[in-house]
Curated annotation (Swiss-Prot):
Domain EngA-type G: from-to ranges: 3-166, 207-380
Protein name: GTPase Der
Biological process per Gene Ontology, one example term: ribosome biogenesis
Keywords of this entry: GTP-binding, Nucleotide-binding, Repeat, Ribosome biogenesis
Role this protein plays: GTPase that plays an essential role in the late steps of ribosome biogenesis.
Subunit composition and interactions: Associates with the 50S ribosomal subunit.
Signal peptide limits: none
Family indicated by similarity: Belongs to the TRAFAC class TrmE-Era-EngA-EngB-Septin-like GTPase superfamily. EngA (Der) GTPase family.
Organism name: Photorhabdus laumondii subsp. laumondii (strain DSM 15139 / CIP 105565 / TT01)
NCBIfam families: GTPase_EngA (TIGR03594), small_GTP (TIGR00231)
Residues annotated for GTP 2 binding in this entry: 213-220, 260-264, 325-328
Binding locations of GTP 1: 9-16, 56-60, 118-121
Gene: der
The keyword Repeat belongs to this UniProt entry's keyword annotation: yes
Domain (KH-like) ranges: 381-465
Length: 493
């Protein structure tokens, strides 16, 4: 089984920096603010061929209040989940009371615990780490996570019980044998890549579902309702999720990765540097997702921020499902008013399913996954060229394209140009000059004909040059005789 390593410690000791270095991503927000990581975040990492799962947690400083108490609880849960705990301390800041409190908790757990002194670059290491021996956790491993110094050696040491090294027989190869083995491996890799492309089936991959919306619309409550556990910090204060949290799950035999994002608020209200980071992470999560679940607060209605977020989702070409949350407790009159407003302001995304839910009580949440799967299946469905060309000609017969500069537009054939979102490429003469109204007509015609729901369709137009423009036909003997008779007739005139 792949080992699980948890990073714990006070806020701002460098846990997220180490997480990012090990996972080779920027999935954890990193800046010089205490308390940046509020939830536990999972990542897959590999050091010297040894794979492991790393958990980044919120900091514990012993003075938790409000949401900070929840952060501490998330860190303690991560300790229980882990096989190995890396207890990180700040060599520059020195020993703090919270370090003693965390060490006391760890000593009471039967976990492999390693004391890691970070930020040792530019200091006298022996002097800086000496006081941490009073924590009673044995050897101290000094690293500089921001520069990577000591990180590989640390991970190799903590993973040693899981590596199984020392069992393998070392075989010496000659230079010729090593070269032959290398090129054989490269050839095999190329063959496997081709086979993987031919056999690609999107249903075998985890479906990435990004849950997005303004702050405090109930995204984390919905995530926890779906998961059935308090996995993401939920606290009635806008902005309690500052980072995008990637959470693997399984439902009805299908694998998913839920992405719970920080809320996106009006640009003028984004003041803290950390919140600007969070907006970027939300937009990156949308780009990374297969399906986006946009959560709207029924009691606040559709705001400009919601429409801005919708615009970004559409520009990204992602499949879309809309969840109108906090539907419980509203009067029938208010519900009808909200529905009318949705019809009016969301008419441009009429392809998206809209669900009315209560994330807090669970009503309507189960039905979301029918629409999520429908949207993903429509976005990744393979359609052959003959069917797309037939639909194109049907659309042309039902509504002829307008004349362009006195000439009739000729659409020749259509084929698939990509998936997620579905792209239809139409080839022909003057097709790029078609008016936007006719392009929208074609897009809607393809959508209806293919029964596509939950995902935008993109139509691309290409004009091919005449392949015979610079070539002269080779005439048959019969054609040559006809040509001579025609030329003789023209001369007589």
């Amino acid at each position: 089984m792949i080992p699980v390593v948890a990073l714990v410690g006070r806020p701002n000791v460098g846990k997220s920096t180490l997480f990012n270095r090990l996972t080779r991503t920027r999935d954890a927000l990193v800046a010089d603010f205490p308390g940046l990581t509020r939830d536990r975040k999972y990542g897959r990492a590999e050091v010297e061929g040894q794979e492991f799962i790393i958990i980044d947690t919120g900091g514990i400083d012993g003075t938790e209040d409000g949401v900070e108490t929840h952060m501490a609880a998330q860190s303690l849960l991560a300790i229980e989940e882990a096989d190995i705990v890396l207890f990180m301390v700040d060599a520059r800041a020195g020993l703090m009371p919270a370090d003693h409190a965390i060490a006391k908790h760890l000593r009471g757990r039967e976990k492999a615990t390693f004391l890691v002194a970070n930020k040792t670059d530019g200091v006298d290491i022996d002097t800086a780490i000496a006081e941490f021996y009073s924590l009673g956790l044995g050897d101290i491993y000094s690293i500089a996570a921001s520069h990577g110094r000591g990180v590989t050696q640390l991970i190799e040491r903590v993973l040693l019980p899981f590596s199984g090294k020392g069992e393998e027989e070392v075989v010496e190869l000659t230079e010729e044998e090593a070269n032959a083995a290398y090129w054989a491996e490269q050839e095999q890799n190329e063959i496997e890549m081709v086979e993987e492309e031919e056999d690609f089936d999107p249903s075998t991959l985890p479906l990435k579902l990004a849950i997005v919306g303004k702050p405090n619309v109930g995204k984390s409550t919905l995530t926890n309702r779906i998961l059935g556990e308090e996995r993401v910090v939920v606290y009635d204060m806008p902005g309690t999720t500052r980072d995008s949290i990637y959470i693997p799950m399984e439902r009805d035999g299908r694998e998913y990765i839920l992405i719970d994002t920080a809320g996106v608020r009006k640009r003028g209200k984004i003041t803290e540097t950390v919140e600007k980071f969070s907006v970027i992470k939300t937009l990156q999560a949308i780009e990374d997702a297969n399906v986006v679940l946009l959560v709207i607060d029924a009691r606040e209605g559709i705001s400009d921020q919601d429409l801005s977020l919708l615009g970004f989702i559409l520009n990204s070409g992602r499949s879309l499902v809309i969840a109108v949350n906090k539907w419980d407790g509203m009067s029938q009159e208010d519900k009808e008013r909200v529905k009318e407003m949705l019809d009016y302001r969301l008419g441009f995304v009429d392809f998206a399913r809209v669900h009315f839910i209560s994330a807090l009580h669970g009503s309507g949440v189960g039905n979301l996954f029918d629409s999520i799967l429908e949207a993903y299946d429509c976005a990744t469905r393979r359609v052959n060229t003959s069917l797309l060309t037939r639909i194109m000609h049907m659309a042309e017969e039902d509504h002829q394209p307008p004349m362009i500069r006195g000439r009739r537009v000729k659409m020749k054939y259509a084929h698939a140009g990509g998936y997620n979102p579905p792209i239809v490429v139409i080839h022909g003469n003057q097709v790029t000059d078609l008016p936007d109204s006719y392009k929208r007509y074609l897009m809607n015609y393809f959508r209806r004909s293919l029964k596509v729901m939950g995902t935008p369709i993109r139509i691309q137009f290409k004009e091919g040059a005449n392949p015979y423009a610079d070539k002269r036909n080779t005439l048959t003997p019969n054609q040559m005789r006809k040509r001579k008779r025609l030329m003789a007739h023209l001369k007589k005139r």
